[in-house]
Amino acid sequence: MPLLKLVFLGTGGAVPKADRMLPAIYLEDWLGHRVLLDAGEGAQYRLLQVGVSPASLTLVAVTHGHEDHVLGLPGLVITSRFLGGKVRVLAPRSMHKALERLGVEVLEGYAAERLKITCVEVCHTVDACGWLFEWDVGYKLDLQKATGLPKWALTSLIKGHPVEVEGRVIRPEDVADPAHRRFKRLLYTGDTGPCPRMWETVGEVDVLIHEATFADDVESQKAHEEGHSTFADALEAARALRAKVLILTHISARYPDKSRHRQLAAQVTPPPHVYVPDDFDTLLVQL
């Protein structure tokens, strides 16, 4: 079953609070990939608090070079090295030289057998990447073509594996419908203002993790000039991208708590389902 585990290690932005640290999200998928989305100050300690070794990370995906998103990276790299790991970092091109001086492997994208991660340009005040995750979740079967096959064979074929039944090898494409393969997508924006060009580039997603630095008490023009979004901006993005789930992070320290964001979220008729997590909250998402 395609299942994502998201642990919100830091849900604040720019200035930390005692209960709201700087941006960092741990993502673990059902295939075993472990990805840290941004590395705010203290990210390695927060990983350890939730039982994840920095050395076990598949990747760190950094959205841009502002300090609140990267100050946790040097310590994480050093700790991982001591533990025998090697950190690979996805980052915008403008950050590559600086990151290489840390001794990390720097990548522009990632491609494995069933997961692809690509940079999508967002609308911030500096060079910045949103990170688009696309999972290959297997074949959608044509039930007429698959008639008579045992359940175990159907399970393997759906996952993209060939099977042998009564001496005959059956490949997934032999019993696939015209739609062929199925994909599920998640987009993590990092910092961004409203960004129609990004929506057009991406198309549709299942899950959107979008910043909502401000609720509804700041003029939208001011937020946009700073390269940030309001609650309404994030909701507009989710609807443009046809997201089923919208998760709001990067909440300004001007808010003592997240009650206003949650009041606004409660007024939204799904889709999308809107979540405003606290630090250390865990969200399981079935794709």
Swiss-Prot record:
Organism: Pyrobaculum calidifontis (strain DSM 21063 / JCM 11548 / VA1)
Entry-linked InterPro entries: Metallo-B-lactamas, RibonucZ/Hydroxyglut_hydro, RNase_Z/BN
Keyword Nuclease attributed: yes
Subunit structure: Homodimer.
Enzyme Commission number(s): 3.1.26.11
Alphabetized UniProt keyword annotations: Endonuclease, Hydrolase, Metal-binding, Nuclease, tRNA processing, Zinc
Annotated family: Belongs to the RNase Z family.
Protein's UniProt name: Ribonuclease Z
Reaction catalyzed: Endonucleolytic cleavage of RNA, removing extra 3' nucleotides from tRNA precursor, generating 3' termini of tRNAs. A 3'-hydroxy group is left at the tRNA terminus and a 5'-phosphoryl group is left at the trailer molecule
One of the record's GO molecular function terms: zinc ion binding
SUPFAM superfamilies to which the protein is assigned, alphabetical: Metallo-hydrolase/oxidoreductase (SSF56281)
Binding-site positions, Zn(2+) 1: H64, H66, H124, D191
Free-text function comment from the UniProt entry: Zinc phosphodiesterase, which displays some tRNA 3'-processing endonuclease activity. Probably involved in tRNA maturation, by removing a 3'-trailer from precursor tRNA.
Catalytic site positions: D68
Cofactor-binding details, from the entry: Binds 2 Zn(2+) ions.
Gene: rnz
Gene3D superfamilies on file: Ribonuclease Z/Hydroxyacylglutathione hydrolase-like
Sequence positions that bind Zn(2+) 2: D68, H69, D191, H250
Reported cofactor(s): Zn(2+)
Pfam families the record matches: Lactamase_B_2 (PF12706)
Taxonomy of the source species: Archaea, Thermoproteota, Thermoprotei, Thermoproteales, Thermoproteaceae
